[in-house]
Amino acid sequence: MTTWNKCLKKLKKSLSTFEYKTWIKPIHVEQNNYLFTIYCNNEYFKKHIKSKYGEIISSTIQEFHDGDLLIEYSNKKFSGEKSPEVTSVGPQANFFNQKNVEIKDDSEETSLNQEPKKSQKKLSSKNSASQELFGFDEAMLITDKDDQEYSFGLPLKEKYVFDSFVVGDANKIARAAAMQVSINPGKLHNPLFIYGGSGLGKTHLMQAIGNHAREVNPNARIIYTNSEQFIKDYVNSIRLQDQDEFQRVYRSADILLIDDIQFIAGKEGTAQEFFHTFNALYENGKQIILTSDKYPNEIEGLEERLVSRFGYGLTVSVDMPDLETRIAILLKKAHDLGQKLPNETAAFIAENVRTNVRELEGALNRVLTTSKFNHKDPTIEVAQACLRDVIKIQEKKVKIDNIQKVVADFYRIRVKDLTSNQRSRNIARPRQIAMSLARELTSHSLPEIGNAFGGRDHTTVMHAVKAITKLRQSNTSISDDYELLLDKISR
């Protein structure tokens, strides 16, 4: 058995199946006494292998080779007779001083017993071929801690998991769909299109899908990115005349997750490339998950053929969570941070921060940090003081009659129509919206709200809240109206 075949045997056990087949197996190694020439086929492959696997290759060869050693990396194809199973891999090695070992490539040579040259530092930096072509480097590969398998794309953050996602009426359908596709990708809801305003949890759900899918199937090739990076990758592939590699990477995914897909609208070349990528993945039963700030039909400048394909699967919304869910988010976040947050303080913050979850958590962090530095408990008084420049604390609480007036003006009806017994659709729907807003924006009980709307029963209010919450999930017009009214009343 040759030295390299012995190395292969060990490398196959040391690396994951995915790594071995993807990066080691395609390479060829030629040995001439102390010289091992590693043929990597192209510059991209060579640089990635040197930067990622050079150390393990170097140490493995040293283990089976006696005497001096020179390892040479080449971006050329192997022209001689193919070895039984030849490969090459590896970042520039963090070399050992046991033997005189050198690493060499087409343009540089570095002795293991020397200080690295500037060119070596440059090579081992983020200026690898993959960084130049795809805009990501070794640190931006999705990594599973146990088996070290990699997929291209932006990194998935460990904190974004389903368990840390607080579920409420405004997001429960999206969360359920996300969980389903993470368990059975490509079989249900393909594509899954999640839309909603900024900071409402779309990215959290998307990354939770990736993290959970990797737990279910560690061998899955998961690519998570955003439209900005996708556009950059595509432009770079044209500049480097390597569109084939771009297509190979993105179309090899088992699960493709792209955040903020709306930004490819109007980018003709990128949109066309994404269209073909979508088709290739969809036809092969691969899962596609997309997020946007708008419903597909409402994305200005988006090609009709893409709008049509986005409708192949399931489209779900995430909306601003209601008061109870906002309180739950704050309490969970505080608990995760190891901090105690009184319920009344959580309620105060939730009542006054109604823009999005990101700002809600930001307000919480400010309250907790301020109270900690001042050695005080995070009371309502502390929250009022430190959030004065973040939220406009209303001099007086929102009143139901003000909600009724704003809603009536918005729908061009009379306030007395909202409190009347009329059941026509153009009156009943605004009435339900006004009740739902009153429930979210005031501290009034259900019976009190019902009484303010013509003496209605509390069950009527409950029904109205549930109906509007459900409609906001499926009806973009209702969802947009609700958000506009929420903004008007909260000013």
Swiss-Prot record:
An example Gene Ontology molecular-function term: ATP binding
Segments for region (Domain I, interacts with DnaA modulators): 1-69
Subcellular location, principal: cytoplasm
Keyword Nucleus recorded: no
Binding positions (ATP): G199, G201, K202, T203
Localization: Cytoplasm
Protein's GO biological process: DNA replication initiation; regulation of DNA replication
Signal peptide start and end residues: none
Protein purpose: Plays an essential role in the initiation and regulation of chromosomal replication. ATP-DnaA binds to the origin of replication (oriC) to initiate formation of the DNA replication initiation complex once per cell cycle. Binds the DnaA box (a 9 base pair repeat at the origin) and separates the double-stranded (ds)DNA. Forms a right-handed helical filament on oriC DNA; dsDNA binds to the exterior of the filament while single-stranded (ss)DNA is stabiized in the filament's interior.
NCBIfam families xref list: DnaA
Assembly and oligomerization: Oligomerizes as a right-handed, spiral filament on DNA at oriC.
Official protein name in the record: Chromosomal replication initiator protein DnaA
